[in-house]
Swiss-Prot record:
SUPFAM superfamilies: ATPase domain of HSP90 chaperone/DNA topoisomerase II/histidine kinase, GAF domain-like, Homodimeric domain of signal transducing histidine kinase, PYP-like sensor domain (PAS domain)
Lineage summary: Bacteria, Bacillati, Cyanobacteriota, Cyanophyceae, Nostocales
Organism from which the protein derives: Nostoc sp. (strain PCC 7120 / SAG 25.82 / UTEX 2576)
Gene designation per UniProt: bphB
Protein name listed in UniProt: Cyanobacterial phytochrome B
Pfam families, A to Z: GAF, HATPase_c, HisKA, PAS_2, PHY
Family: In the N-terminal section; belongs to the phytochrome family.
Keywords in alphabetical order: ATP-binding, Chromophore, Kinase, Nucleotide-binding, Phosphoprotein, Photoreceptor protein, Receptor, Sensory transduction, Transcription, Transcription regulation, Transferase
Chromophore binding domain: annotated span: 22-511
Keyword Hydrolase in annotation: no
Residue intervals of the Histidine kinase domain: 536-751
């Protein structure tokens, strides 16, 4: 089978390409010799099958022999001294003279270790070392000065391409940068005019699969002098010590994938060299060198290029970080202000949205939503609220990370396709996934055209026998693709800023919760003291008031004949005032007792309660002619029957009292809304209440009318009703149209 053919008899799976074991090909390129030794005794275990051509010795003459069969004693001693180094990279290359075919040949020897084996790779060196050193030292020094004088990554990339071409003499030199999906783009290029330009073209991640990128991360430089080479096998194919293929990950002679060779041939490239550019120990890009004819680059020149790549990686990282510095400072400033706003306000949501800058400015989003405790607040351009709620539900079930960022939401969440105008990009920050508390940032779709070097979607071809063959594309002509459903990508520091905001929110919310808990403790203590004071004060005041009231009556009865009319009137006023004060004190005493008496909870039929109240009020009902409407049976609830009876009594009595209509009516019922508790109501067509008084009416002794109107009263009834309802874990509120009537609603929860 020809090693350039890879046939796939079944369904094409591009992941197979990424699984090709390119680090253990069992083959090398023919421009050098590979020796595998047992380091402890320098016994030769494996050799490349071209030793006779280069070293004048057949493989069988070398296998299982000591390295002294090739090297003189002085050279062996030097090698042993060098092997004391932990990292052999610092000693490379060693220069050894070896006799081959009755001729002494100088070799560059490149050493490295692999799985406790010593690997020596020999390349013939015919150059003038002294002349080469000074020449390339000058070139590299000049290149570094030029690179240090650049201001942006674009400038440094162009200078880098120019200088590498000057040092190596390759026809074309490009700087190729990876994006987050490992697609590559040519961002700088130097070439002769007759060659087609690749500048600005994009190449799919499949062109340089994952395992190839891993090797680029381990080795700074890779040379292919002639793509038409015949690979040289390693003899024996497996290492005799462990019967495993030899790991050539760090080998400079390692044979490359047949797919890569075909890729080069399809591009019209015969020789190539790649130099890695790293940032934060991650592959950032490549310096890609192409030549139309075979081209061998000596090791010292490759070393100069490798050094240039390493220095460029440092410069590139610094330049790129510098380009983002101003933006990062701005983000930090926005973050600090948001924290200040949240610390100063009780509601952190309003703090994030209502000020300038707000959460949009933190990540340069066009819209944002804060979803917290079932409520959502938005700012900017956002999806409709129902779509946000569905998205939050999907997030809570499918995304388990604290932060999720994508510039193509529809890729993972197909329903987002209809939201492309506002939500093609998303950062979702989970405050509490279980409670579905999120902050969402949105970016709209940005339709753009990507220029590809050939069609990136055609990795296969059908050959004559009908088989499907995985093959690099044959055309690298400009191929345009319109990219939809993608937003402007999020920068890493923007995502990090959102994540830092989460920590700030949690810290502030916890702080506010602690402060609120302390306030609640103080409030509870104050309420208990106030209840105790009200109870004692009302109890102690009743006795003197009763005395004043009684003695006023005694004066009227015993001395009424001798008291003149003005005196009698003043005495009657005193009796009325003391009676009213006694009524107020009774109400206060009753109100204070509500908080001191335990609830007597039991299953209670509210129909019985309401009918008992109506019987008690029957006289007033007949007197006023009010119509009582009960449209449905009321449920059985778990409550304190006496206290809930008092709630209905107060509400029904008020509906009778505050009604000036000729045809009066009162409706009593409830609204069933599972799984929520039922909502009870008392509705009338009375005088109504202005909206500004909806809260006021529940304050103790707060009346909206003078005591002489609508039959008087203490103004404590609704306050007592509110306290009873709240002790049952419910709430009470009013809806009313002034002049038309009111509806009082209340809920109860099992306590």
């Amino acid at each position: 089978m020809n090693i350039n053919d890879i046939t796939i008899p079944f369904q094409v799976d591009l992941s197979n390409c990424s699984k090709e074991p390119i680090h253990i090909p069992g083959l090398i390129q023919p421009h050098g010799v590979l020796l595998v030794l047992q380091e402890v005794d320098l016994t030769i275990l494996q050799v490349s099958n071209n030793t006779f051509n280069i070293l004048g010795r057949h493989p069988e003459q070398l296998l299982n022999q000591h390295l002294s069969c090739l090297l003189e004693a002085e050279q062996l001693s030097l090698l042993k001294d060098c092997l004391a180094q932990e990292d052999l990279q610092i000693i490379n290359p060693l220069e050894f003279i070896i006799k081959s075919h009755n001729e002494s040949i100088s070799f560059d020897v490149i050493a490295h270790r692999s799985n406790n084996l010593l690997i020596l790779e020999l390349e013939a060196n015919l150059s003038d070392k002294t002349h080469s050193f000074f020449r390339f030292y000058h070139l590299v020094k000049l290149a570094m000065l030029k690179l240090q004088g650049t201001a942006t990554t674009t400038e440094i990339s162009q200078i880098l391409a120019q200088e590498v071409r000057k040092i190596t003499g390759f026809d074309r030199v490009m700087v190729y940068r990876f994006d987050e999906q490992w697609n590559g783009k040519v961002i700088a290029e130097v070439k002769p005019e007759y060659l087609t330009s690749y500048l600005g073209l994009n190449y799919p991640a499949s062109d340089i699969p994952q395992q190839a990128r891993k090797l680029y991360s381990q080795n700074w430089l890779r040379l292919i002098p002639d793509a038409k080479y015949q690979p040289v096998p390693i003899v024996p194919i497996n290492n005799p010590l462990n019967d495993q293929p030899l790991d050539l990950s760090r080998s400079v002679l390692r044979s490359v994938s047949p797919l890569h060779i075909e890729y080069m041939q399809n591009m019209g490239v015969t020789a190539s060299m790649s130099i890695s550019i790293m940032k934060n120990q991650k592959l950032w890009g490549l310096i890609a060198c192409h030549h139309q004819s075979p081209k061998y680059i000596p090791y010292e020149i490759r070393s100069a290029c490798e050094f240039l790549g390493q220095m460029t990686s440092v410069e590139m990282s610094a330049k790129e970080d510098s380009e983002d510095t101003e933006d990062k400072i701005q983000v930090k400033s926005v973050h600090s202000k948001l924290v200040q706003y949240m610390s100063a306000e009780n509601d952190f949501i309003n703090a994030l949205i209502d000020h300038q800058p707000n959460i949009l400015d933190l990540v340069k989003a066009q819209g944002a939503a804060v979803c917290f405790n079932g409520n959502s607040c938005t700012v900017g351009q956002v999806p409709p609220m129902p779509d946000i709620q569905v998205l939050v539900e999907w997030m809570s079930q499918n995304i388990h990370e604290e932060i999720f960022a994508t510039d193509s939401l529809a890729t993972v969440y197909p329903d987002a396709e209809k939201l492309r105008d506002v939500a093609s990009g998303l950062i979702a920050l989970s405050i509490s996934r279980s409670q579905k508390n999120y902050i969402l940032w949105f970016r709209p779709e940005v339709v753009r055209t990507v220029d590809w070097g050939g069609n990136p979607h055609k990795p296969v071809e059908v050959i004559a026998n009908g088989e499907i063959r995985l093959s690099p594309r044959k055309s690298f002509d400009l191929w345009k693709e319109t990219v939809l459903l993608k937003s402007q990508p999020w920068k890493s520091h923007e995502v990090n800023a959102a994540l830092e905001l989460r920590s700030a929110i949690i810290g502030i919310v916890l702080q506010k919760a602690d402060e609120l808990a302390q306030l609640n403790i103080e409030l509870e203590r104050s309420n208990q003291e106030l209840d105790a004071f009200a109870y004692i004060a009302s109890h102690d005041l009743k006795e003197p008031l009763r005395g004043i009231h009684n003695y006023s009556n005694f004066l009227m009865e015993d001395y009424g004949e001798i008291i003149d009319a003005p005196g009698k009137e003043k005495l009657l006023t005193l009796i009325r005032l003391t009676q009213r004060m006694e009524d107020l004190i009774d109400s206060l005493l009753h109100f204070s007792r509500l908080g001191r008496v335990d609830l007597s909870m039991q299953d209670t039929d509210l129909n019985e309660i309401v009918h008992r109240i109506l019987d008690m009020l029957s006289g007033r009902i007949e007197e006023t002619g009010v119509e009582i409407r009960i449209l449905q049976l009321l449920p059985v609830v778990y409550c304190d029957r006496i206290q809930i009876g008092e709630v209905f009594s107060n509400l029904i009595a008020n509906s009778i009292k505050y009604n000036d209509k000729a045809n009066k009516w009162i409706e009593i019922g409830y609204i069933d809304n599972p799984p929520l508790p039922p909502t009870f109501y008392v509705r009338d067509n009375g005088i109504g209440i202005r909206e500004k008084h909806f809260e006021t009416i529940f304050r103790i002794f707060k009346r909206l009318h003078s005591p002489s109107k609508y039959g008087g009263g203490t103004g404590a009834g609704l306050t007592i009703a509110k306290k009873i309802v709240e002790r049952h874990g419910g709430k009470i509120w009013v809806e009313s149209t002034y002049g038309e009537g009111s509806t009082f609603y209340f809920t109860l929860q099992d306590v």
